[in-house]
Amino acid sequence: MLDNLAANEVRVFLWHHKLSRPDIQEYADICVSAEEKGGLSNICDKRFVEKVSVRVILYKLLGKDVRICYNENGAPYLSNKQYYISISHTDGHFALSFSHRKHGIDIERWNSTAKRVSKMFATEQEVAALVDAKAITDEDAKAFCTIWSAKESIYKSHDFAGLSFRDGILLKKDAFSNLVAEVSYKEATFHYAVEYRLLPDCVLTICLPASV
């Protein structure tokens, strides 16, 4: 049921399904802790499916006693703090990652929206280096989706509240053709490595602080 992907020091578990709220309710009865069930009763069907799907993945891996909690900025963490985690979902794809290091993941279904609104999150320098130069993929729409997803995973990796995707994150390829990022935030500079997987109907990006 779960796809298991390894990326450096991160393990990502993916579940793809098209279950509705009534379909997935039986999973909620089994996999969701009593403490969390109260918070699921009054949310919309889409959010219910997203939250339960991620908790099913967690249950399969660590059991029912471990819960997903959220800090003041909305970032998820495990109740036992055994691992750092990150969560993402898009149109029937649900992802949960684990690592002993802070990190971020994002999954985006292939679409044309990212290309249409690219000026909101990508600079001309990034477009020239990564899209026009075919550094990510031969398909422009997929390249823009990957840039957007990479910046989402970077944002999640460090709780960068208020960070500008366009002006605060610069993506490029290093000398070994790896995707790297420089983040400018509150007069400080951070460096990240981003791994990406071009899947049949979506892109998955995984971000970790760059090794020093």
Regions found by a protein language model. Give the residues of each.
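Core catalytic alpha/beta fold that binds nucleotide/phospho-ligands
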Residues: 1-212
